[in-house]
């Protein structure tokens, strides 16, 4: 799998391209700006770009209106297809944000329910009770994601919903030639849905990468042969953040040894987790590419802006074993000197 030895560059398109925070309905091809960065991203050593939400939404991107259309604030499907083509020409894979747990109140099927209530053919696409009311006085109650009622939870046990999502993924492959998906709040997704998604993506006949957003807990529940290829390793991200900002080097040592140490009992031997390394502000135009930055070795965890990020995939395999051992040795020495242990 190509992703197992990749460095990912994350772009939050709405912020990166300077789009309005609220969808104003105007079609502006701002997404084409990303093509200007392709050479710079490649020279950083990144060979994949992960795009945060790109599709039509009410505001921040995670409140989707339509999975089939690029957000008008960013341009059209043709504009984004041109960007993907440029990235591929520079040897950069494209991964999109799959926000399948919830949609926005402006989602086309939810608007049909608002209008037709019981008579809507899409009422079972969501978790709805018509004997209640919502915070927005819709005349029915619905489940929002973790109490955020601007984000309407999809019913992923409904075959029609699953089929719609799969049809959209196939469309993305055909129009944009994407190479994978990052699943938003994967810890909330029905595991049967994840299995179906993996089977569908495997059937596409390509090395299609699936990585899930997981915070804490047992990553093995979601990563495996019939599940996701990888997940976000927030445990190590927290350790990296603490090591650089609080000089707490014990935490990252503990996390690395717990996850990928030499003992047989370590949690994720043989698995590949996506580690968040750095967050940066993005200038209006690409910086000079004369001296490539060492993105692979950057361990800076400052919290600035979600315009762009860098990730590396780590695994308990030969290619990464040396770097893991080196990191833990360094952390042990520094922790010992600082008296933290």
Model features per residue range: what roles?
Residues 14-31, 63-77, 147-162, 179-188, ...:
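The substrate-binding groove and active-site-proximal loops of carbohydrate-active enzymes
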Residues 11, 41, 51, 67, ...:
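Conserved, mostly hydrophobic/aromatic
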Residues 114, 174, 184-267, 292, ...:
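Active-site-proximal helices and loops of the catalytic beta/alpha 8
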Residues 7-10, 49-51, 94-96, 181, ...:
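Hydrophobic faces of well-ordered beta-strands that scaffold small-molecule active sites
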Residues 2-5, 26, 255-259, 264-341:
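Loop/helix patches that line or flank the sugar-binding groove of alpha-linked glycan CAZymes
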Residues 1-93, 101-103, 108-112, 147-148, ...:
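N-terminal structural segment of carbohydrate-active enzymes
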Residues 90, 108-151, 239-262:
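Core domains of carbohydrate- and sulfate-ester-processing enzymes
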Residues 26-27, 60-72, 100-140, 199, ...:
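Aromatic- and acidic-residue-enriched segments that line the glycan-binding/catalytic groove
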């Amino acid at each position: 799998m190509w992703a197992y030895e990749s460095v990912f560059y994350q772009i939050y398109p709405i912020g990166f391209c300077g789009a309005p925070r609220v969808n104003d309905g105007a079609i502006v091809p701002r997404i084409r700006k990303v093509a200007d960065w392709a050479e710079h991203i490649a020279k950083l050593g990144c060979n994949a770009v992960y795009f945060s939400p790109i599709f039509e939404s009410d505001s921040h991107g995670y409140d989707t209106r339509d999975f089939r259309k690029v957000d008008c604030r960013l341009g059209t499907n043709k504009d984004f297809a041109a960007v993907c083509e440029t990235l591929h020409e520079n040897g950069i894979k494209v991964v999109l944000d799959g926000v399948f747990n919830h949609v926005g109140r402006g989602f086309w099927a939810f608007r049909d329910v608002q209008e037709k209530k019981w008579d809507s053919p899409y009422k079972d696409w969501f978790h709805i009770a018509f004997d209640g009311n919502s915070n927005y006085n819709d005349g029915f109650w619905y489940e929002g994601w973790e109490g955020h009622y601007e984000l309407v939870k999809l019913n992923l046990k409904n075959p029609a919903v699953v089929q719609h999502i799969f049809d959209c993924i196939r469309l993305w492959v055909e129009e944009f030639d994407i190479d994978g998906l990052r699943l938003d709040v994967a810890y909330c997704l029905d595991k049967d849905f994840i299995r179906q998604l993996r089977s569908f993506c495997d059937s596409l006949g390509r090395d299609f990468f699936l990585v899930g957003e997981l915070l804490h807990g047992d990553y093995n529940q979601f990563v495996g042969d019939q599940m996701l290829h990888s997940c976000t390793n927030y445990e190590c991200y927290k350790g990296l953040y603490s090591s650089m900002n609080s000089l707490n080097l014990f935490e990252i040592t503990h996390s690395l040894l717990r996850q990928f140490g030499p003992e047989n009992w370590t949690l994720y031997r043989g698995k590949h987790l996506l580690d968040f390394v750095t967050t940066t502000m993005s200038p209006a135009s690409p910086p000079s590419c004369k001296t490539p930055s060492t993105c692979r070795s950057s361990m800076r965890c400052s919290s600035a802006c979600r315009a762009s990020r860098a990730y590396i995939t780590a695994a308990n395999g030969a290619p990464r074993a040396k770097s893991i051992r080196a990191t833990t040795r360094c952390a042990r020495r520094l922790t010992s000197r600082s008296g933290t242990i």
